[in-house]
Amino acid sequence: MSEDGSNVEPGGFPRFESLEEPGSEISDLLDEASPYSKSKDSNQIYEANPSKDTEQSAASFTSQLDRNEEKNTGIPFSETNIADIIPLSIEESLQSSGSSETKMAEDYYPVKFPTGRKFRGRIFNGNQKGLDMKSDNFTVNLDAKGLQEFPVDIVKVKYVKYLYLDKNQIKNFQGIDPGDLLGLEILSLQENGLSSIPLEIQLFHNLKILNASYNEISQIPKELLQLENMRQLLLNSNHIDTLPSGLEHLRYLETLSLGKNMLTYIPDSLSSLKNLRILNLEYNQLTIFSKSLCFLPKLNSLNLTGNMIGSLPKEVRELKNLESLLMDHNKLTFLAVEIFQLPKIKELHLADNKLEAISPKIENFKELRLLNLDKNLLQSIPKKISHCVNLESLSLSDNNIEELPKKIRKLKNLRQLHVNRNKMITMTEEISHLSNIHILEFSGNQITHVPIEIKNCRKITRVELNYNNIMYFPVGLCALQSLDYLSFNGNYISEIPVDMSFSKQLLHLELNRNKLTVFSKHLCSLTNLEYLDLAKNQIMTIPSCISAMVSLHVLILSDNKFESFPKELCSLKNLRVLDISENKLQKIPLEISKLKRIQKLNLSNNIFTNFPVELCQLQTLEELNISQTSGKKLTRLPEEVSHMTQLKILNISNNAIKDIPKNIGELRSLVSFYASNNQISSLPSSFLSLEVLQSLDLRGNNMTALPSGIYKLSSLKEINFDDNPLMRPPMEICKGKEMHMITCYLQRADERDEKILEKIFNIVANSITETNFEFLQQKLNMASSANNMPVRPTTPLNERIYQALIKWKAEKDVQFTATALRDKLFRALNMIGAYDIMDKITALNLYTSAIKL
């Protein structure tokens, strides 16, 4: 249910409830999916929220997605891998003229996000208002319903066009008749654990799109090749090692995605797919760029990322319509000159290869928009790159480049330039002529200064110059009115110039690991600054003018020279995160209560003698770290800590705290409690009130027992009691929880201890004299047990002793574990001087310990 109690996803999309039993009847679900069951928004559109941390190559996808949303078109795939081919306008393409020559490639785009990310979307659900039985646009979504069989009841819905069965356990299509689902055009079977594509697939004659990614399919059946209307076939993340013969039957196929399989070669028959526009073969085991790939006349996008290809064939020049070539993470040592005969290439990804040089013929790439040459062995870039006048993104990081060509100034459309971790000593002035540059990254070089002419790059928004040899803050950057992100970590800057006060538009500033000795007053003029990192400098005080920094949300001052908490910080009323760890703070001022919005506070590795109770006034605090790996140790956690009712994460590790406050249970929001390497011997009973606690770390303490009801912490997922006197946590911790492995371990441990105790009883029974056994009975208070046992006159002594010990164990089982009884028996044997028996028991213990190890 949504937060408001409705059965609707955010954005207005219907939410399906889970089936009670896998494989149960789905007619109710079909009724729920029916447009007649509920009134739904007729203008539902596809929603997407890609991560901001994407490659530059995703920019074109983002803009196309925006256009798509403006048109209210949608995506039929409820979830697909972000590295797969993402459909952008299925509805539009399938409702076109109906011709088999439909140009679906325009509705698809190969997305190059970091591999492994998941793209979550929702099915298109438009045109439902007024839908009747004559409609040919019905969608059924049965994702993650626990289905084990194909839902044959689906045939009750006559006009199913899009069917989604992702994340079930469907293995076959039994029960489907040839006449059923004749109108089905899209079928998605992601994550069903399929070992093969069901042969019944051939019955869906009108199928145009099949997505069977994330299964365990090892081969493509010939029956699939009979689906002549197939436009798009997605089989990513399976175990396919060969392509079948007969591919020529899929003559209308436009998209073939076989990423993350086990293909070692590409058959010549692939060249028969004359309408293929998008081919994804990323992360297979290809060692050769097959010539058959070169004779796909309509191929627009080719992804060979993550293979072991060492060279390109001359025939690559035949790919006249190729616009996007992805060959990152291969073994290319050179580029065949024929590749520079591709007139339409717009994106070329060659990162993480072994290229030593780029041919001057790169000048032929007049349409090139993106060039990624990261992680190669390049020492220079050809001057002719200046002829790539449409280039927008150039990435050269992690090479051995010493300088950029002066003619780079001609790249008037360049928006992003990444030259991190090379061998550059100077930043050429020619960069100042890049009038459209937005992002400039030169981190990890040996640059000593930034030319003043940089001020001419008026559109720059982000500059990164970390870990260079810059001694003076580049004043040219202060004139850039669009600059909002600036990072100068790991340089030798000792002061901030007055010009900095003019950069009022700056939002993010990093200057950690420099030589600053004061918090410059010029920084106080940055009234829009939200993030400031001054860690690992030599700052001792904070000026009062910091109160002018009204937008500051994150302030990092760790590893400086503060000997007292600067009261001036307490004027930052919008501060959310403060890190002032690794200093020499001894106390916290009362004024800290003025930080009304503080959420995260790191005070670790200072020299507090007592826990600063002033912190307990922070009603909005969610994370507190006051751990100590060096210096003075805290010995007490005050009861006032319970006042921080919003606290979610508390870290008091590496101190000398002995007791946890009795009212700790009042921290009802606590999710993680880190208290390793202290001197804690027990937890108070109120600890059981921490109902949302998920992580508990009590390593290296003096814990001898845990509250018996700790199993009531139903949210607990991670526990660590290593290096405590506990033999093991009590069984109650794990019973009924999701820690089945621990439960099994504890059960086996109990069984093992029981067997060891029985062996010890046998040793005692077969070794002790009758006189000594009488003494042993007295020490163990078991005389009554032995005397009340029915013993036959002929029963051997060792049998009588063994039965007496078993009876004693039965009486004590409720109170003591097998291990405790063993220790109790061992002490009693020592009292009566039965040293020979003790030696035998010790030998047994050593033997069992060795076996366990």
From Swiss-Prot:
It holds the Pfam family LRR_14. Residues 19-31 have a biased composition (Acidic residues). Keywords: Leucine-rich repeat, Repeat. It comes from the Eukaryota. Gene3D superfamilies: Ribonuclease Inhibitor. LRR repeats lie at residues 133-157, 159-180, 183-204, 206-227, 229-251, 252-274, 275-297, 298-319, 321-342, 344-365, 367-388, 390-411, 413-435, 436-457, 459-481, 482-503, 505-527, 528-549, 551-573, 574-596, 597-618, 620-641, 646-668, 669-690, 692-713, 715-736. Residues 56-65 have a biased composition (Polar residues). Residues 757-845 form the Death domain. Residues 1-78 are annotated as: Disordered. The keyword Repeat applies. This is Leucine-rich repeat and death domain-containing protein 1. The lineage of its organism: Eukaryota, Metazoa, Chordata, Craniata, Vertebrata. The gene is Lrrd1.
